[in-house]
């Protein structure tokens, strides 16, 4: 059984892959289309069931749109190689930004488990995420994890193994759009961002910072704003597509 590990850059994805497999892969995003995917059996420390589990470390990506080399590798593997399950590593400290990608993965028909990673850091900041409600809204399991301490890894792997062959109803379906039409892409991204942000408002409680926002919050505010987020993500995708054309 092959389990694809997906997530935004710097979500802790490769740290989780190393923990699950005992490997020591370089932590960082893949560079260039010539780099092959990484895959290795999951250690018995994290799974003692009857299945042979192979973890596949895919490049960090913000979207399933294949406009960058990293996104192309990730999108191509999930769509063409048909992994048995996906562990989507979501950065708990940047929930809105991460869930844009999550909702795209849930449209593909492959069972998804969300690993709500860096939960320890998020809680130290005074923030809270209701993972039970988030699971209900997404229609998939959500498990808190901390890759650096192995917290939650056995649970997330066990759940992924249990989901083999299971069906999941996607919470959001975009439909076909013309990727060459900037206005159409922006409109589609706007709707997805609005859907994601509506979920986040229901499940996340953030500690109010009285003096200034930290750098991550500032970036998150730009990327998940219904207007600026569209400009940032869509423009980057379109420019990358034009360059490759």
Model regions and ranges:
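Conserved G1/Walker A P-loop phosphate-binding module
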Residues: 1-56
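Canonical P-loop GTPase G-domain recognition
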Residues: 123-169
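Conserved C-terminal guanine-recognition region of P-loop GTPase G domains, centered on the G4
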Residues: 77-81, 85-140
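Short, membrane-interfacial amphipathic segments enriched in basic
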Residues: 203-216
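Short, non-transmembrane cytosolic segments of multipass membrane proteins
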Residues: 167-200
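Switch II (G3) loop of P-loop NTPases
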Residues: 53-66
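Loop-to-transmembrane-helix entry motif
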Residues: 222-226, 230
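Single conserved hydrophobic/aromatic residue that forms the stacking wall/gate
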Residues: 237-245
């Amino acid at each position: 059984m092959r389990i694809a590990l997906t997530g935004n850059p710097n979500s802790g994805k490769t740290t989780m892959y190393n923990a699950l497999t005992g490997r020591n892969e370089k932590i960082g995003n893949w560079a260039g289309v010539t780099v092959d995917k990484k895959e290795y059996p999951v250690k018995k420390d994290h799974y003692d069931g009857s299945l042979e589990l192979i973890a596949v470390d895919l490049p960090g990506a913000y979207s399933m749109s294949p406009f960058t080399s990293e996104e192309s590798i990730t999108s191509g593997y999930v769509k063409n190689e048909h992994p048995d399950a996906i562990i989507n590593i979501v950065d708990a400290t940047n929930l809105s930004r991460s869930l844009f990608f999550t909702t795209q993965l849930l449209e593909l028909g492959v069972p998804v488990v969300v690993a709500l990673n860096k939960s320890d850091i998020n809680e130290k900041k005074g923030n809270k995420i209701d993972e039970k409600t988030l699971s209900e809204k997404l229609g998939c399991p959500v498990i808190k994890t901390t890759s650096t301490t192995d917290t939650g890894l056995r649970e997330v792997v066990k759940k992924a193994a249990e989901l083999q062959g299971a069906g999941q109803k996607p919470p959001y379906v975009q439909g076909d759009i013309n990727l060459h039409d900037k206005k159409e892409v922006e409109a589609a991204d706007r709707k997805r961002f609005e859907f994601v942000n509506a979920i986040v408002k229901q499940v996340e409680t953030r500690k109010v910072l009285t003096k200034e926002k930290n750098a991550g919050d500032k970036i998150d505010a730009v990327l998940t704003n219904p207007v600026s987020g569209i400009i940032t993500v869509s423009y980057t995708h379109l420019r990358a597509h034009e360059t490759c054309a």
